[in-house]
């Protein structure tokens, strides 16, 4: 076998592989003999038909099979001998097999880029430092109370935090528009559900009031026909309600699985959950900054094939996230939607992979156990979850990969420029939610 390697453009390589005629002819004869023994030929016993007839009947089939086998086996040998790492399946272009002649084919494919991660010491990370304060705990308890609140009708002017029930008809230049009309519409004032100015116009109004709301749709509004348009909403307020928060009674506490009904036990459980959520958010913040710095310090070419594979994976995840689709009912989500995210994933994967290989990072079992225990605390029976992971090798390997990634992040962090900044619990959690 002879091999020549050509760089066509960027990461694309073209191998021209030549297989000696003797090797090809022997493979064709073997294939023809096999076909002669298994195929029925009128007038001849199995395996007794003349070679000329066998070639005439099965020659094309034999050549196709041999060409396929030769391309697959010799391509693998060629990339091993030339130390090439394909980033995707090759495009094969074979010449026709001719008896007594060498068989030549080309294989075109992309390779992974060759690079060494550098610039770790230039990465800047602002490490947020936060704790769950009593005020944060109190706010969370209030949130739980609001989630179980009831509403009571009042004879009062609408104010922030109150719920109103109203009818309205929207128009632009005197003409009603689709989606601009509602009856019995419920709205909690201050929730920010409506376009700017809508809720403000309701403040101070009482049940029975009829009024007009003048607003302008934002320039980036989702409906193309409404962007930047001035509109009027002829409105009537039907009902004003105030929120009634439940007291921290034994009955209320039991709703959250605290069988004793003890308020302090509820607070302890909520604090534990908040601390777990905070720890994850702090970790995510640092990790995101490390990866951003790693990418900025190492600009590398990306194989188009690897990016395309990642786009397909992201597209499938999106379809599953939105409920899944059967057969041909799935919408065609354009690649452009996922291009940036896919490129980042591939780039981060390549860079982190190099850090892991270069530093020979292996999963630390203590770290693996710590990750499992942390995940288990979110379940009712942590012990059962831990045992499940320990008995499931596939799940365990997934956690080991997470541990290796965490260890790589820690290594980069040890070389980076790190400063600490005290921040509030809400700030960390809100940033984490926005990034998700």
UniProtKB/Swiss-Prot annotation:
Gene3D superfamilies, sorted: 3.10.50.40, Trigger factor ribosome-binding domain, Trigger factor, C-terminal domain
Catalytic reaction(s) noted: [protein]-peptidylproline (omega=180) = [protein]-peptidylproline (omega=0)
Subcellular location, record wording: Cytoplasm
Annotated InterPro entries: PPIase_dom_sf, PPIase_FKBP_dom, Trig_fac, Trigger_fac_C, Trigger_fac_C_sf, Trigger_fac_ribosome-bd_bac, Trigger_fac_ribosome-bd_sf, Trigger_fact/SurA_dom_sf
Biological processes, Gene Ontology terms: 'de novo' cotranslational protein folding; cell division; chaperone-mediated protein folding; protein transport; protein unfolding
Cellular component terms per the entry's GO annotation: cytoplasm
Keywords assigned: Cell cycle, Cell division, Chaperone, Cytoplasm, Isomerase, Rotamase
A GO molecular function held by the record: ribosome binding
Alphabetical list of SUPFAM superfamilies matching this protein: FKBP-like, Triger factor/SurA peptide-binding domain-like, Trigger factor ribosome-binding domain
EC code(s) of this entry: 5.2.1.8
Pfam families to which the protein is assigned, alphabetical: FKBP_C, Trigger_C, Trigger_N
Domain notes: Consists of 3 domains; the N-terminus binds the ribosome, the middle domain has PPIase activity, while the C-terminus has intrinsic chaperone activity on its own.
Entry function: Involved in protein export. Acts as a chaperone by maintaining the newly synthesized protein in an open conformation. Functions as a peptidyl-prolyl cis-trans isomerase.
Protein family according to the UniProt entry: Belongs to the FKBP-type PPIase family. Tig subfamily.
Protein name: Trigger factor
Organism: Aeromonas hydrophila subsp. hydrophila (strain ATCC 7966 / DSM 30187 / BCRC 13018 / CCUG 14551 / JCM 1027 / KCTC 2358 / NCIMB 9240 / NCTC 8049)
Gene field: tig
């Amino acid at each position: 076998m002879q091999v020549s390697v050509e760089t066509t453009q960027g990461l694309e390589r073209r191998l021209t592989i030549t297989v000696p005629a003797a090797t090809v002819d022997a493979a064709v004869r073997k294939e023809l003999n096999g076909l002669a023994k298994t195929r029925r030929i009128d007038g001849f016993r199995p395996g007794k038909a003349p070679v000329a007839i066998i070639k005439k009947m099965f020659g094309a089939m034999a050549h196709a099979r041999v060409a396929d086998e030769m391309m697959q086996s010799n391509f693998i040998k060629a990339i091993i001998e030339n130390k090439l790492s394909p980033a995707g399946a090759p495009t094969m272009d074979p010449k026709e097999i001719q008896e007594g002649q060498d068989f030549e084919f080309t294989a075109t494919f992309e390779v992974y880029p060759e690079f060494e991660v550098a610039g770790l010491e230039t990465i800047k990370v602002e490490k947020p430092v936060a704790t769950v304060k009593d005020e944060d705990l109190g706010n969370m308890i209030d949130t739980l109370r609001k989630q179980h609140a009831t509403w009571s009708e009042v004879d009062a002017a609408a104010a922030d935090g109150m719920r109103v029930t109203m009818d309205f008809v929207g128009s632009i230049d005197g003409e009603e528009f689709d989606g601009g009309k509602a009856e019995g519409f419920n709205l909690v004032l201050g929730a920010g559900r409506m376009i700017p100015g809508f809720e403000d116009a309701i403040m101070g109004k009482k049940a029975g009031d009829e009024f007009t709301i003048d607003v302008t749709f934002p320039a980036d509004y989702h409906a193309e026909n409404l962007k930047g348009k001035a509109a009027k909403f002829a409105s009537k307020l039907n009902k004003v309600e105030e929120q009634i928060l439940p007291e921290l009674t034994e009955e209320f506490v039991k709703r959250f699985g605290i069988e004793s009904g003890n308020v302090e036990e509820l607070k302890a459980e909520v604090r534990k959950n908040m601390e777990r959520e905070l720890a994850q958010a702090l970790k995510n913040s640092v990790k995101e900054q490390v990866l951003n710095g790693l990418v900025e310090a190492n600009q590398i070419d990306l194989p188009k094939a690897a990016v395309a594979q990642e786009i397909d994976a992201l597209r499938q995840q999106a379809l599953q996230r939105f409920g899944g689709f059967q057969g041909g009912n799935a919408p065609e989500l354009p690649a452009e939607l996922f291009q940036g995210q896919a490129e980042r994933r591939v780039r981060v994967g390549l860079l982190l992979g190099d850090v892991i290989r270069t530093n020979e990072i292996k999963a630390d079992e203590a770290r693996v156990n710590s990750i499992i225990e942390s995940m288990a605390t979110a379940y009712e029976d942590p012990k059962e979850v831990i045992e499940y992971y320990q008995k499931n090798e596939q799940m365990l390997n997934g956690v080991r990969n997470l541990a290796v990634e965490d260890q790589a992040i820690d290594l980069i962090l040890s070389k980076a420029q790190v400063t600490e900044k005290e921040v509030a619990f809400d700030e960390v959690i809100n940033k984490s939610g926005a990034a998700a």
